[in-house]
Amino acid sequence: NNRSQSMQTAHNHLIVDAYNANPTSMQAAINSFKGDTFILGAMRELGEYTHLEHQNIVNMLAERKADLVYLVGEEYRLTTSPYPIFDTVEDLHVFLQDNPLQDHYILLKGSRSTRMEKLLDIL
């Protein structure tokens, strides 16, 4: 159902929340997640706060010293992110085909419109 659920794939353990992402839920998920890998989609419908809120997420990840981060959505291009940014989930899917993740504990979260669940088959 894409709402916060834990799942084990053949290669990784995932926490999947591909239904809703707003600044509060994104920050809470990052703070409570005990894993090492983050795949985060854009937060949509933030209007004039889009840049600020996406930068806040990037800053949280940097402060946490996250091991591996992939960001999905053009909204992240406005930030000073040190992490790879993919404009679409399809772009990240292609990248992961050539750079598969193995034995990671992954938080997969993004707004419904980013369709983060499209990555499940490759994770």
Regions found by a protein language model. Name each.
Residues 1-123:
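ATP-dependent carboxylate-amine ligase
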